[in-house]
């Protein structure tokens, strides 16, 4: 089976396991109808933490996942950066400063996406589509 390869993968390979769990908090004043966590949801927050928070209720239950991650946004203030808490990943990112013309920028983008893709995969049903 083909495998995605990128520089820095060894630093982020298991990062999804170390993301701190933060339970979802219902905000009844922000919704319509009964406040519940078992239907359609809008989750406000860092997507990495939001994905981790969805696991207890939705692991293996999501039929379809569609993502539209930022890529080549042209935004000079952000070029595939990630606000990570892992010292190993932070050390790697600090040692490899991110620049728009950086030859490693796609590797850095893959490092940012990898833990999110791993968590998304955990949410996906056996018969689900990505």
Q: What residues fall within each predicted segment?
A:
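DnaQ-like (DEDDh/DEDDy) 3′-5′ exonuclease domain used for proofreading
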Residues: 1-66, 71-117, 127
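Helix-to-beta-strand junctions that scaffold the AdoMet/dcAdoMet cofactor pocket
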Residues: 123-125
